[in-house]
């Protein structure tokens, strides 16, 4: 039996940090349902390279997960999502701060309705403070954190570390 067998995770994350975290939970035996936007899904579905028409990047981060397309602005889809929430143990999200609150699914609202639900969120600059609303792609985090100042050629411009270490570490901590 896997350590997280019987645990249901609703994964509203996208790109790398969040899907890395939910992928780890899936690897540990949780049932993970990835909730994606209709028509476009996770941005990484469009990231090359492609194998048999599918993004290898997306496939690697989302292996072992189930997927459902829901528009959380549409009443019918909200009803489906709320039925999933009633059964879920964990919900993960990595939207910019305030998005889940505007949808009516922020921590306070979910905690009131589903007090046993574990709510995990990751954002580049936190959920409060002067930079909370800024996007934080890995290159931005590497630059702001200073790691790019110690890479590359001496006397040359800063260079991004090849691996997306900021996103991977954020995903590890979200797990």
Language model features with spans:
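N-terminal helix-loop segment corresponding to the beta1-alpha1 unit
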Residues: 1-175
């Amino acid at each position: 039996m896997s350590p997280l067998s019987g645990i249901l995770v609703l994964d509203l994350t996208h790109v790398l940090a969040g899907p890395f975290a939910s992928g780890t939970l899936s690897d540990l035996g949780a049932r993970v349902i990835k909730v994606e936007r209709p028509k476009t899904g996770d941005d990484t579905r469009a990231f090359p390279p492609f194998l048999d028409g599918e993004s290898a990047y997306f496939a690697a981060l989302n292996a072992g997960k189930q997927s459902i397309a829901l528009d959380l602005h549409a009443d019918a889809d909200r009803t489906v999502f709320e039925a999933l929430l009633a059964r879920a143990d964990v919900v993960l999200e990595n939207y910019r701060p305030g998005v889940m609150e505007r949808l009516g699914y922020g921590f306070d609202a979910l905690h009131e309705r589903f007090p046993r639900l574990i709510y995990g969120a990751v954002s580049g600059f936190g959920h409060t403070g002067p930079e909370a609303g800024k996007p934080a792609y890995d290159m931005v985090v590497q630059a702001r954190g200073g790691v790019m100042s110690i890479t590359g050629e001496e006397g040359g411009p800063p260079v991004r570390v090849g691996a997306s270490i900021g996103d991977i570490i954020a995903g590890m901590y979200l797990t």
